[in-house]
Amino acid sequence: MKKSTIPSMSALTLAMSLAFGGAAIAQEQVTGNQFWWPEQLNLSPLRQNAVESNPYGSDYHYAEAFKSLDLDAVKKDIKALMTESQDWWPSDYGHYGPFFIRMAWHSAGVYRIFDGRGGAAGGQQRFEPLNSWPDNVNLDKARRLLWPIKQKYGSKISWGDLMVLTGNVALESMGFKTFGFAGGRVDDWEAEQVNWGSEKAWLDSKRRNEKGELAKPMGATQMGLIYVNPEGPNGVPDPLASAKEIRDTFGRMAMNDEETVALIAGGHTFGKAHGAHDPSKCVGADPAASGVEAQGLGWKNKCGKGHSEDTVTSGLEGAWSVNPTAWTMQYLENLYGFDWVQTKSPAGHIQWIPKDGKGANLVPDAHDKSKRHAPIMFTSDIALKEDPSYREITTRFLKNPKEFELAFAKAWFKLTHRDMGPKARYLGADVPAEMLIWQDPIPALDHPVIDNADIKALGNKILASGLTVPELVRTAWASASSFRGTDMRGGANGARIRLEPMMNWQANNPKELAKVLAKLEKVQKDVNSSLKGGKKVSLADVIVLGGSVAVEKAAKEAGVTVSVPFTPGRMDATQAQTDVSSFAVLEPTADGFRNYYSKDSSHSPAEMLIERANMLNLTVPEMTVLVGGLRALDANSAGVKHGVFTDKPGTLSNDFFVNLLDMSTKWSKSEKQEGIYEGQDRKSGKLKWTATPVDLVFGSHSELRAVSEVYGAQDGQDRFVQDFIKAWNKVMNADRFDI
């Protein structure tokens, strides 16, 4: 059979198997490599959302498309949608606002600080597993309600932006003044590979250490939840224990106690919970598990109407406020105006109602005007009253409505924008003017930048400063590689490597770093004193240029004359603009590019290399060439020699690959150093090299070896240098959202 006929035959087989119930497919499941070799290093994180996956093509630039959008027209359309109830999914109280607030919140609320993953950017709520999480029940309908608007504006607004904007408009349509909105969230085209936990069942919780602490980087207490179980930890209705979990999980989203209280109290001012029936008897499969005829919708409810007064979502039932479609103080007034006792929803879930039947007719029914109900609270709501810190905040907010309103506005803005990175990425006319500390502010460029002649002169001064090639490369890499593309934080801009906490990170070799920075600061000061026409250069630029001229020098010594691109314009942040605790989570526990690994790392050295490369948005070839080049440049953390497979360190040669692939070397585990390997001459037994697993994986892993062979070939030197410079420049400019 010709290979070209296989795809069409496969399509025919698929169609026939689907027609007959899928039996043929079930019998022909392919056993993949991961089954046979589960310990094999997984490179797929470096192949996510490739440009080829984007149907808009490589010439499409979302920022430009968004700038052509009439944002006011979009908001007008969204506002109209709020009260245009659809028969297939009617709105509660005649208003979709609370439903869309939940959608936006749950889109953004999966963000977590430890790895920067989650959040609204990418529009990941559309994909598995988030689109089928138990905590996201029925949000498939919210996105489907939005489709006509997304269809109308097409490529000009992403799903990520649209969901957040809709949450804002929902709040505004119910009388709340939001803090602002920024566009700029570029959509993904596939599910992001995220460690959401190892549990094999929804709502299971096997993510705590022996001390009972939630494992990093998890942001929720149970599989499939955004934060906590609203009924209490693992369903136990203990408000104080719930408060402890709330504080932990919201803290993992970068929220302090005041922001946490504002979000919960503000969010629960609107809408209601849905638990009209027992979900086990009424609700069908989630979207991912539903048939093709469901067209991406799930949780089909066979009880009653299947919606409206028969809706089943969380299993909890009722509203917190008397007017659930308006901004009021009723949530806090009710929280403190009643004593609360436990009861069960019609679905059998634990919730709280006023004691002694009080308030029984306060809350209107969402669909039947002839009915009224008592307000309800979750265990997680009662926690805001019983926990001492939360109680102080809620009582203060109750007495100061304007303070509460501003706190919720700012907390909502932070919730929905935390994963976007610095303000330089914000788009649109609704961006608030105020600079917030969690945006990692950097001063705006306020002077002319240096020109090519200045750059050349500055580079020469750096090389004449007495600093070595490895020292300059290590410092530039430490500065720039702090960037993580998951939430666009870190990077060389701002020169925060000279500030707390980065200046004392172990991976950055603080003692050497202080020496290098002192010399670079002197060069910067001398150059700035001689520049004309108001021109200046920042230390951030000097650090990057220092690494770049060092690479040029190292390439020349390897016989290749090159020019490393350099674009000035970075600025220097101050310590006051740097939240130490916020930046602390960026500290690397491992950096395979520098052969640094600490025992605090959550995975093996090779796996942590993939994680770091993924954070830097690198491809497999880019990661490979950078590791080989940085080893040749002797850029390991603290100057360790593992993996420096060359007799001329500090030279940009392809020796790492040549010597790694050399069959005259036999590798074995060191008997003296844990986690270290020794390379001995096969004939003499003489020790030639030492290495870490990160070094050796480029010869042992079949795919990485294939790339290594390209750079280790006799004609590989020039390609190696050129590719290294491209990858180096990519990392140095990873946070340059201004170019």
From Swiss-Prot:
InterPro entries, sorted: Catalase_peroxidase, Haem_peroxidase, Haem_peroxidase_sf, Peroxidases_AS, Peroxidases_heam-ligand_BS
Keyword Oxidoreductase among record annotations: yes
Protein name according to UniProt: Catalase-peroxidase 2
Residues with site note (Transition state stabilizer): R102
Pfam families linked: peroxidase (PF00141)
Family affiliation: Belongs to the peroxidase family. Peroxidase/catalase subfamily.
Stored NCBIfam families: cat_per_HPI, PRK15061.1
Biological classification of the source: Bacteria, Pseudomonadati, Pseudomonadota, Gammaproteobacteria, Alteromonadales
Enzyme Commission number(s) from the entry: 1.11.1.21
Molecular-function GO terms, alphabetical: catalase activity; heme binding; metal ion binding
GO BP annotation list: cellular response to hydrogen peroxide; hydrogen peroxide catabolic process
Cofactor: heme b
